[in-house]
């Protein structure tokens, strides 16, 4: 028997939109993503020793001008390798690091400042680990899914690419996760008659980091009622908050305000890049609002469909906070640039007249 969507999680086919099933609990949504580990030989720190969380986007800049910088995301320092002068960094990478056999010095920055340099680096291959399965608990399956499970062949159990749609407690779309799904096993669920526990394997290889569970649970309860709910978060969690703000915005339609609207940005907490975009989003679209997560995205939002119609005005309060923290940023290759000035230029080009206060 087919059903309407209900519950927090909906498993849907990305090709034809068919809903495979709906449930209220998923095991394996949170976990520890696979991370790359790099050893930086003869590490020479700049300013201070690199410890703990390093940055959301850390660039490894080779001394060879013919090579682009390499990116590590959500980077942590494991400290010095015992008995050596090496530093160990771990982070999410795209496996597009140094070419095979690369030898040469590398300088490291986190977009805000240089962290240090090394004479050489190498990627440490991790032990082979299988990704834990994703288990949808108490799933109300569609007739099509029941038929596939009854057939039982591996081909029938291949659901191809699916979207795990996630809703908040009010039933409003929050975000979704795309992956390739193969049914590994299923069994009757203890949560109710005609419900199953569906185990999927293969495609869900990037779980939400466990340390972000409390932040996600805040969003499960619904969007914030007041601006600056994110202000007490550190940069790492501000970035995760921004990711959810952006993903939620992509699930929703936005009504543009008429031209001539006067916006106000509360800038006292704009001490890093995520805070800049969070404050701008809330200035235009209220608490939990989105108006770009990078310069190009701001340009897109200025074009319409994200709550704004040109021309308009923006009063940026406490603008000196952003100027102090964002005017000496580093490009991937390590060149200085003024993000604060860049944002002002993008807003002006989009018909937003900004007054700094």
Give the residues covered by each predicted segment:
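A generic structural signal for short, non-catalytic loop/turn and secondary-structure boundary residues
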Residues: 157, 191-193, 255-258, 307-309, ...
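Hydrophobic, Leu/Ile/Phe/Ala-enriched alpha-helical segments that form helix-helix packing faces
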Residues: 149-153, 249, 253, 280, ...
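Short, glycine-/small-residue-enriched flexible loop/hinge segments at domain edges that mediate gating
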Residues: 312-321
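Phosphate/adenylate-binding glycine loop and adjacent helical scaffold
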Residues: 1-231
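Helix-rich interaction surfaces within compact, conserved domain-sized segments
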Residues: 323-357
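Conserved helix-adjacent loop modules within structured domains
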Residues: 55, 70, 256-259, 264-313, ...
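Short glycine-rich, low-complexity/disordered patches
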Residues: 159, 167-172, 290-297, 356-357
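Extended, compositionally biased accessory segments flanking or bridging domains
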Residues: 2-13, 19-26, 224-287
């Amino acid at each position: 028997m087919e059903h309407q969507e209900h519950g927090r999680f909906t498993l849907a086919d990305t090709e034809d939109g068919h809903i495979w099933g709906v449930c209220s609990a998923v095991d394996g949504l949170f976990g520890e993503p696979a991370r790359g580990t790099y050893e930086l030989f003869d590490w020479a720190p700049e300013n201070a020793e690199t410890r703990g969380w390093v940055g959301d986007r850390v660039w490894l800049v080779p001394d060879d001008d013919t090579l682009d910088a390499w990116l590590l995301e959500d980077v942590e320092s494991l400290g010095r390798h015992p008995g050596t002068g090496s530093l160990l960094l771990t982070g999410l990478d795209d496996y597009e690091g140094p070419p095979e056999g690369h030898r040469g010095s590398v300088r490291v920055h986190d977009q805000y400042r240089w962290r240090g340099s090394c004479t050489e680096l190498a990627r440490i291959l991790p032990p082979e680990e299988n990704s834990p399965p994703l288990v949808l608990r108490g799933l109300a399956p569609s007739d099509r899914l029941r038929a596939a499970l009854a057939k039982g062949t591996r081909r029938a159990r291949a659901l191809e690419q699916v979207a795990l749609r996630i809703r908040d407690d009010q039933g409003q779309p929050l975000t979704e996760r795309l992956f390739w799904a193969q049914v590994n096993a299923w069994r009757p669920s203890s949560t109710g008659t005609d419900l199953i526990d569906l185990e999927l394997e293969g495609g869900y290889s990037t779980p939400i980091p466990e340390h972000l569970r409390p932040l996600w649970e805040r969003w499960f309860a619904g969007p914030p009622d007041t601006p600056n709910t994110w202000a007490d978060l550190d940069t790492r969690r501000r970035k995760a908050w921004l990711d959810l703000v952006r993903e939620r915005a992509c699930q929703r339609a936005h009504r543009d305000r008429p031209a001539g609207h006067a916006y106000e940005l509360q800038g006292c907490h704009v001490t890093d890049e995520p805070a800049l975009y969070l404050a701008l989003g809330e200035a235009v679209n209220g608490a939990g609002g989105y108006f770009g997560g990078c310069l190009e995205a701001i340009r897109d939002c200025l074009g319409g469909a994200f709550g704004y119609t040109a021309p308009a005005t923006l009063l940026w309060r406490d603008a000196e906070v952003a100027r102090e923290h964002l005017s000496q940023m580093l490009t991937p290759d390590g060149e200085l640039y003024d993000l604060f000035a860049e944002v002002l230029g993008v807003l002006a080009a989009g018909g937003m007249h900004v007054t700094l206060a």
